[in-house]
Structures are given as C-alpha cells and as structure tokens.
C-alpha cells in the first residue's frame, strides 16, 4: 500500500505508476511511502 502526504503527491505517484515505473521509484519521486500494512500513518492518508 502507498501512503502520500498530500493529494498532489498522490497524483504524482499515480501518474508515475501509469508510466510503468516501480512502486519504490514512484514513491521516491512523489514523496510517498510504501508500507507493508493496510493503514497509513496519521497525515499520510492520501
């Protein structure tokens, strides 16, 4: 699951993923993070 700090970051992440890039690369580019669980930390719920 990916967790992003803002809607803008989420949009960047989603657009990056559409290009076929990996989750880790897109998370790094957008400022989002990949977690192993199912619930994002407070403030990372985008």
From Swiss-Prot:
Q: Which GO terms describe its cellular component?
A: extracellular region
Q: State the protein's name.
A: Ligatoxin-B
| Superkingdom assignment | Eukaryota
What does this gene product do?
Answer: Thionins are small plant proteins which are toxic to animal cells. They seem to exert their toxic effect at the level of the cell membrane. Their precise function is not known.
Q: Which SUPFAM superfamilies match?
A: Crambin-like
- Stored Gene3D superfamilies: Thionin-like (3.30.1350.10)
Where's it mainly located? Answer: secreted
InterPro entries to which the protein is assigned, alphabetical = Thionin, Thionin-like_sf
Query: Can you name the source organism?
Result: Phoradendron liga (Argentine mistletoe)
Q: List the disulfide bonds.
A: 3-40, 4-32, 16-26
Q: Write out the GO biological process terms.
A: defense response
Residue spans crossing the bilayer = none
